[in-house]
Amino acid sequence: ISFQRIANFNSEFGFFSDVLGDNSIIDFYLQDAFGVPENQIESLGLTGLAYQTYLINPIVRDAQGNPINNPNSYDSFVLGNPFQDENVQQDGSASQMTFSYGANFNHKIFIGGGVGIRSLSFTSVKRYNEEFIDQPLSTSSLRETLFINGTGINLNLGLIYKPIDYVNLGFNFQSPTWYALSEEYEAEMIANYNNYYFEQEDITLGRQSALTDLFISNYSLRTPMKIGGGATFFLGKNGFVSADVDW
């Protein structure tokens, strides 16, 4: 029985800028919302959160001032370019416990095999922030949380054959790893306004927040199979010659 740490996902990275950006993430929300009727916009992921926190708002009247029923175009009263920063924190690991067995037949054939049980856990938290100067909106933040965990199983087999003392022939087989994984995702958006009176909705905006539903999904994953073979020829005290191939 052996235990192996296959991967370590612990990391933290991001960026921070002390100069104004060329655009805002609000520009993306406006583009993404274009053509989507207002009665469907709340279900549009992050753009739906932007709608719920008043970062984007429907254009409710046409050029002649007539009301539009269920509008599908949007604008924003937030102008100018913001300071921007982002931070990503990742945690987790992948490991494997292997149960193996080997046998020797007359020092001619050596066989080994094992069953590997893998476990995987991964968490990612992304935080993106914008800060505006002299705007109705002071700051906006977006937090996205992703959690993945699951287990997997694989098989491996190795064979060495010695037809004569100075020749070794080898074969190895690594099965795919079959994973069963569970994933959870949610996002939260917070917009902090400077007590801005939004006439269209007759509301004074302060701290506005919105949260997506918790999205849960279960799925399977299979990694590639690996097969290999090789031969080694021993040349006495002069060394050896070896050749291997994997596919």
Task: Please annotate each region the language model reported.
Residues 2-247:
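Outer-membrane beta-barrel porins/channels
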